[in-house]
Amino acid sequence: MRHISFKDSFFTVLLIVIASLAYNKRSTSAFIDYNEPGSYKVQALSIPTEIEFAGETIQLKEADLIERMDKELLVNTYWQSNTILMLKRAHKYFPQIEKILAEEGVPEDFKYLALIESGLENVTSSAGAKGFWQIMRTTGREYGLEVNANVDERYNIDLSTRVACKYLIKAKEKFGSWTLAAASYNRGMSGIKRLLEKQQSETYYDLL
């Protein structure tokens, strides 16, 4: 089995989602010739050389990352049922999330984090994380959410988004980077701290 590094996993998925939605927001005229009834073009997509996330420029130079990006862009462009569902949910919920991110001072790109975590659905993970932002019970209570047998505010989009913002701001203050803040949302602040110390790294991109 090929070794999968931390850097190959969560944040790579985040980049792929950002790039995929950017491509799919383009006009469908790139794939349909309206002058020729019934026409539909299937074509390879060019891979961007860099992506900007939360004001930080990310260079796409690693061969493995480029190959995975290429695969996911093609899948999400031509697997239209899945893409349409993602875009419909994004159209419905992103404005609500964007407003709160702006009020809390968190970059708008973090709306994609909720999409990755839950597909913008109130789901429950095998570990017990719940809601759009997949918040654990202890974390929710730590950040002021009411979580008990009768009420679970992790399912409240507004309240859970504000909790996610508080967490991300705290992580940004701790690590000095929105990229590391995003990575810590999945791995935990202590987990990222241990990785940075163990590998004597200062940035997300130096992690193996």
Feature map (PLM): residue ranges:
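Catalytic glycan-binding domains that act on GlcNAc-containing polysaccharides
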Residues: E62-L208
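An acidic, Gly/Ser/Thr/Pro-rich helix-cap/linker signature
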Residues: M1-G105
